[in-house]
Regions:
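Hydrophobic, well-structured mid-protein blocks that either form specific transmembrane helices
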Residues: 38-84
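Acidic, serine/threonine-rich low-complexity disordered tracts
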Residues: 1-47, 85-183
Length: 183
């Protein structure tokens, strides 16, 4: 969501909800509510894991056993064991694109281990990752998105930086409640 001042020029309120199987972390349902300037769109995708089909607005497409939505993909990546994360190695993920109603293959690359300072956690050891982000109305064609995750078994995303069509987005966790995690 954009700040009040920025909203005077270009309001962005995008909400994503992912319902997933808690053991496999595979998508069962994905909801996307978009407001970007004057553009508005609400979409829901249902994933039938028994028939390997995804449905959106009565259109069915084939999916694989490993197809994710953008949120469940992040959770699935967090389960990769530390010993399988190799700096500069490419990790591939298949994601369902609601807007185009199709599958696309994407990837991310762990670039380096880095100690960063955050408002909530202070100095923390992280792995800086470079995910491939598809160009759209918000994201520019510059492939310069970075995500920092904790360098531990949990891989908590603590910071994101990405260029957009009209500037850049910086995301950082500034508060957390009811978590059982020691940084």
């Amino acid at each position: 969501e954009t700040t009040k001042i920025f909203s005077l020029f270009y309001k962005v309120q995008d909400y994503f909800k992912s319902y997933m199987d808690t053991s496999s972390l595979l998508s069962l349902e994905f909801r996307r509510f978009i407001q970007e300037g004057k553009y508005k769109k609400n979409q829901i995708a249902y994933f039938d894991r028994n028939s390997n089909k995804a449905t959106i607005q009565n259109k069915k497409i084939d999916i694989t056993n490993y197809t994710q939505d953008v949120i469940s993909a992040l959770y699935a990546c967090r389960t990769i064991p530390n010993e399988e994360i190799i700096i500069n190695d490419t990790i591939f993920i298949q994601v369902y694109n609601l807007e185009k109603k199709e599958m696309f293959n994407t990837y991310f690359v762990p670039i380096k281990k880095e100690k960063i300072k955050t408002k909530l956690f202070g100095e923390i050891n992280t792995i800086k990752c470079h995910p491939h982000v598809q160009k759209n109305r918000i994201f520019s064609d510059k492939d310069e998105t970075y995500i920092w995750v904790t360098d531990d078994q949990y891989h908590v995303p603590v910071k994101v930086e990405t260029p957009i069509q009209v500037g850049s987005i910086y995301i950082e966790i500034i508060d957390a409640e009811n978590i059982n995690y020691k940084f």
